[in-house]
Amino acid sequence: MQRIMLRAKLHRVTVTEADLHYEGSCGIDEDLLDAAGMREFERIELYNVTNGERFDTYIIKAARGSGAISLNGAAARRAQVGDLLIICTYGPMSEEQSAAHKPQVVLVDDANRVKEIRKFPA
């Protein structure tokens, strides 16, 4: 049996841009992608801490070191610049893999720079 498990999480990043007329997706600073082990075009689930919205889209790379978190297309209706988000990826794992799995959690500062990387639970 396979279980769908939390693989990685960007915790409380701040939306820096919302562009309704761009072709879908979520732009994420490459430094954050590397820290979380996330990849371009990977499906993500987003949880808006500010307004309670929950939605999904896919990743595109934003400039390294920019702190960018941009919501594009329809996703731009789900959050505003300044909103706090939790961005998660999930993946299938066997019973054995899931028993030992510890998701990667990336904590950021107010400028969306990596502050700490944790394996959860600590």
From Swiss-Prot:
Pathway: Cofactor biosynthesis; (R)-pantothenate biosynthesis; beta-alanine from L-aspartate: step 1/1. InterPro entries: Asp_de-COase-like_dom_sf, Asp_decarbox. Heterooctamer of four alpha and four beta subunits. Catalyzes the pyruvoyl-dependent decarboxylation of aspartate to produce beta-alanine. One of its GO terms (molecular function) is aspartate 1-decarboxylase activity. This is Aspartate 1-decarboxylase. Pfam families: Asp_decarbox. It comes from Bordetella pertussis (strain Tohama I / ATCC BAA-589 / NCTC 13251). Substrate binds at residues 57, 73-75. Belongs to the PanD family. One of its GO terms (cellular component) is cytosol. It is found in: Cytoplasm.
